Amino acid sequence: KRNARNRDNHKPYMTLGHYWKFSEKLNIQSNFYAIVGKTSNTNLNWFGANDPRPDYYKYLPSYFISDQGTLTGNQTITEQSDYQQILDGWQSNDPNTTQLNWDLMYQGNYNNLYTQNNIGNTQSSLTGKRSKYIVEEYRLDPRHYGFNSFGKLNINEYSDLNFGLNASIYKSKNYRKMNDLLGGDFWVDIDPFALRDFNDPSLAQNDLQNINNIVREEDIFGYNYDIHVNKNELFGTYSYNKNRIESFFGINTSTTTFWRNGK
């Protein structure tokens, strides 16, 4: 058995704490943390081939039911034999109807001998088994480091001062990589939807600096960028409580900077 969609989430969390009792009136607690790992999601993709998903709307019994008569309940079946065959397959839980046909995808890739010209803005070409079906992987690899410190000062029996700071640095690598060519030799990095809508190969290129980019297993393609987020915060509160008089004063200042570094 095999799944087209797999999720792998592995992000270990490390913390280091320190408690400092400076005096009877002043205590400070500090913490450092780090998160390093990855989140991975796989998915099927295809080009120049039929949709392999068994629940694609054209493969369901409802596709063969006419919209006419919907309000009156007098709908008609356009293709009785196809409708009945698919309906029987779903009702009997036939794996040929309800599951992905991996053998068919492998066979389609094996038989697709193709010559790709004009690779990387050059006159070079490549002949091999061009994959029609692939398993691609969407990755988010975070690196998150932070520090915070909190203190409490007992000024006297009526008043206290609380203060602290937070600082964090976050960077995540976001990219798509080739997980499995399903028996093929390479994949060409173009957008099939743009090619369909505009019928212009130049508008379908995902990488304008590398026309007709050839992708092999474990290669990064489609998109590749880093997200950076840096945060800093300072705060303090003063409280006073005596008899029937109670007061509170607080101040907070913070900065957040973020940017995207595309590749």
Roles of regions detected by a PLM:
Residues 134, 159-263:
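Signature of Gram-negative outer-membrane beta-barrel scaffolds
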